[in-house]
Amino acid sequence: MTTITDAKIASVQHLYASFGAGDMAGVLSVLADGVDWAAEAAGDGAPWYGSYRGIQAVPAFFEAIGTNVTINEFDVVGLTSNDTDVVATVRWSFTVNKTGKTAAMYMQHWWRFADGKIAFFRGSEDSAQTVAAFS
């Protein structure tokens, strides 16, 4: 097992593990109060697309995912960091609860840190696949 020495990568891994366990308090524990969180996409094809400002708004992002899709796969396949940022590549697939359609893709997550906490998040995915799964 590899020992993580980069505190930023360890925080992102903690967030992913907390998400996987349904532990919202664990997710929020690594976020700055004024976190700037957004899932960027062309249009509004998924309920979680858009901006969430501040730690109190972030749970709505996860609720939008959890109530609309069943996650079939969520695998962090790569993490890299520099002085302020972590970039993650994630493989995920999901089935839309209302349509029964499935999408599978790689996502990119960009995490920026300030004072040891996640202050900025941008996520991108194959929005064409996501929109098709919701239609």
Give the ranges of each region predicted by the language model.
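Short glycine/serine/threonine-biased micro-segments
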Residues: G20, Y52, K98
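Short N-terminal micro-motifs specific to bacterial/archaeal maturation
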Residues: T3, S18, W48-Y49, F121
